[in-house]
Amino acid sequence: MTIAIVIGTHGWAAEQLLKTAEMLLGEQENVGWIDFVPGENAETLIEKYNAQLAKLDTTKGVLFLVDTWGGSPFNAASRIVVDKEHYEVIAGVNIPMLVETLMARDDDPSFDELVALAVETGREGVKALKAKPVEKAAPAPAAAAPKAAPTPAKPMGPNDYMVIGLARIDDRLIHGQVATRWTKETNVSRIIVVSDEVAADTVRKTLLTQVAPPGVTAHVVDVAKMIRVYNNPKYAGERVMLLFTNPTDVERLVEGGVKITSVNVGGMAFRQGKTQVNNAVSVDEKDIEAFKKLNARGIELEVRKVSTDPKLKMMDLISKIDK
């Protein structure tokens, strides 16, 4: 049997990618695919991936071909492959990559050879018909900065804290919408995941720090450490994005003295015991209690998956439960 391939994308593109490849090559064996739709999260995707793997022969290894680096299909696949030999994830799947990889499987390459071929053909398959190479000017050498004289310690003022460009509740944490739209539009230099649970999970913590977009660093800390970091003048003026999995952690952070004026609710997946308030957000009694406490502090609670969505008021959605 050949090396197994699983395609994972946002929306329903994965199935169509496979159908396009099969139109060129004929029906393929030992290939699976999963879609990713609103309301799902990494846990849902892991279940979907495992359901596909159960149908495939994984003896020679598994190659996950996903659409975007740091997106939810990538993040879920990364958690599966992290401790398995001959399991790999490649981001940027396109038709040239998929077709060449499927054809190469029939020649019984080694797992590493197939991975290298997939990456190479995916890159080579992206070309412009008429564009000419653009030469980049060499950057001018930077002038040496003058040494600043040491300043005496002083009490922290209102401008001596980090700037919170966005505080967002999204149980998918760093994924496509965060890594692309929100990071650019909020102009942050750091993404900080604030969660006791995630900070204690070494594998998940490591993966999250690897999926930040270019020019942005990612960190995972527990609530207590985030309070200490916020009060450290070393980070004064630095724009950051805070990501949470639930409103309880936000309320704990605010209770600890971190100044948050607005919270964006981007996604809280449905699971048993929760009530769905729209297609992306589900809450239980603990969530509702935390939202009420935040609302009582005068903190804006708005629901949007991406910045171009109209703002919905979280408390209005909660008020409609059981009506």
Curated annotation (Swiss-Prot):
Q: Matching CDD domains, A to Z? A: PTS_IIA_man, PTS_IIB_man
Q: Which residues carry this modification: Phosphohistidine?
A: 10, 175
Q: Which GO terms describe its biological process?
A: D-glucose import across plasma membrane; fructose import across plasma membrane; mannose transmembrane transport; N-acetylglucosamine transport; phosphoenolpyruvate-dependent sugar phosphotransferase system
The residues annotated as the active site are 10 (tele-phosphohistidine intermediate), 175 (pros-phosphohistidine intermediate)
Q: Kindly list the residues the record flags as site (Involved in the phosphoryl transfer between H-10 and H-175).
A: 89
The record's listing under Gene3D superfamilies reads: Phosphotransferase system, mannose-type IIA component, Phosphotransferase system, sorbose subfamily IIB component
Residues carrying N6-acetyllysine: 55, 234
Task: Please give an example of a GO cellular component term from this record.
Answer: membrane
Q: Which PROSITE patterns does the UniProt record give?
A: PTS_EIIA_TYPE_4, PTS_EIIB_TYPE_4
- Report residue spans for region: Hinge: 137-155
Instruction: Note the effect listed for residue 175 to C.
Output: Loss of phosphotransferase activity
Q: Where is the PTS EIIA type-4 domain?
A: 2-124
The membrane topology noted for this protein in its Swiss-Prot or TrEMBL record is:
Peripheral membrane protein
Oligomer and partners? Homodimer.
**Domain topic, free-text comment:** The PTS EIIA type-4 domain is phosphorylated by phospho-HPr on a histidyl residue. Then, it transfers the phosphoryl group to the PTS EIIB type-4 domain. The PTS EIIB type-4 domain is phosphorylated by phospho-EIIA on a histidyl residue. Then, it transfers the phosphoryl group to the sugar substrate concomitantly with the sugar uptake processed by the PTS EIIC type-4 domain.
Q: What does this protein do?
A: The phosphoenolpyruvate-dependent sugar phosphotransferase system (sugar PTS), a major carbohydrate active transport system, catalyzes the phosphorylation of incoming sugar substrates concomitantly with their translocation across the cell membrane. The enzyme II ManXYZ PTS system is involved in mannose transport. Also functions as a receptor for bacterial chemotaxis and is required for infection of the cell by bacteriophage lambda where it most likely functions as a pore for penetration of lambda DNA.
Under what name is this protein listed?
PTS system mannose-specific EIIAB component
